[in-house]
């Protein structure tokens, strides 16, 4: 454990609670001290749903520390079993309560005897995995549990559906634009004549998980949650899966072609015919998605000399890197992810589309990288938005973690062909504010002429005199911060603590 100012991926119990609260009629018991029980407030604020978050905190207090937790945890499980009548209760500790090293499996076994609900302990190592890994593992554990239960009851039907069908795995609460992406993916599959068999975990019942083997293939739109489940279903039941994220015109077409391949492997036998989705891909690419036209427009051509930095989860950061470089011609100076457990896949995806790759979960390292590169725009998480504000660099938010403004009520998918339009808008609008600020200054649109001094870490103690500040204010705002940082570095390098007009012009000559 470590004390941090900012975490890209939360602790493991948050991932378990995301999966539990995504299912319908599933309740989670969180064995935790006060301070770890913020999930309810966070989810209620961000998702803005009508229903209460189905999570109860079993608080570890001084009485628990003296007597032990067993009675309190078991009482909480049985009480929720009677009050809520859930199909499943998931017990999870937090990284803090795990220090107690209690036998929680024994608590679960005891509660299972007197509860009508199924009760399981989240099989997660809270010291070694983060939120995303825990969510992936918990979803696989729940699926494995109910398919095993159906097998023991001899109620597991493995016959596939009469028409092509798919399971969508990984849509969950608190995901980045997950609800919008699901609507777009649902429309995409319907256009292809594919029935949706199950969507897990969001909005599904655990009792319906025994129907998962009926699908022709599994669709995993995000690597972070769902991949372990898809691998398990392929190994255990022979169900193939598609894990190409349909973001951008090229990868959406690639995803559809993979779907076509898996459909045709079964269609030859089940339907005695094959499917051809190429006309659909052509129609959508040329006439529905505006991204291809936009990439050839003068607006997008003007962005080709610009530099960008991209940072986020592995799925969104890799997809955005390929879209900006391959489809829009924008130079990606650095592409990075905080998913250190998936660094090999991320490197493989982006190494041909960017100048350098950054794998870190330290926001200060990301900030210093952005300050060094001085890109025209950043595409990242909520933290990169803060970094951009400090450096006066525009930022488009393209990945979790995000704040409430990136849980829009309107329809804004990032996946599918409609998602390509949303991404094109986001990219273009992120590059524009620099010129807008310049024109506002040029025509005197603001009341103040003060120069905002912004730097990250290295130029502390450097003072600008009023005359040099006035001269700096004459530089267009979209270039001002970059030039100021270079002058600051020049002053520090040459041992100056106060910048005047003479030093300023000497630095500009050396630029």
From Swiss-Prot:
GO biological processes: light-independent chlorophyll biosynthetic process; photosynthesis, dark reaction
InterPro entries: ChlB/BchB/BchZ, LI-POR_suB-like_C, Nase/OxRdtase_comp1, P-CP_red_C, Protochl_reductB, Protochlorophyllide_Rdtase
Database matches in CDD domains: Pchlide_reductase_B
Residues reported to bind substrate: 434-435
Domain of life: Eukaryota
Enzyme Commission numbers on file: 1.3.7.7
Cellular localisation: Plastid, Chloroplast
MF annotations from Gene Ontology: 4 iron, 4 sulfur cluster binding; ATP binding; metal ion binding; oxidoreductase activity, acting on iron-sulfur proteins as donors; oxidoreductase activity, acting on the CH-CH group of donors, iron-sulfur protein as acceptor
Keywords: 4Fe-4S, ATP-binding, Chlorophyll biosynthesis, Chloroplast, Iron, Iron-sulfur, Metal-binding, Nucleotide-binding, Oxidoreductase, Photosynthesis, Plastid
A Pfam family the protein falls into: PCP_red
Sequence similarity: Belongs to the ChlB/BchB/BchZ family.
Function in brief: Component of the dark-operative protochlorophyllide reductase (DPOR) that uses Mg-ATP and reduced ferredoxin to reduce ring D of protochlorophyllide (Pchlide) to form chlorophyllide a (Chlide). This reaction is light-independent. The NB-protein (ChlN-ChlB) is the catalytic component of the complex.
Protein name: Light-independent protochlorophyllide reductase subunit B
Organism the protein comes from: Huperzia lucidula
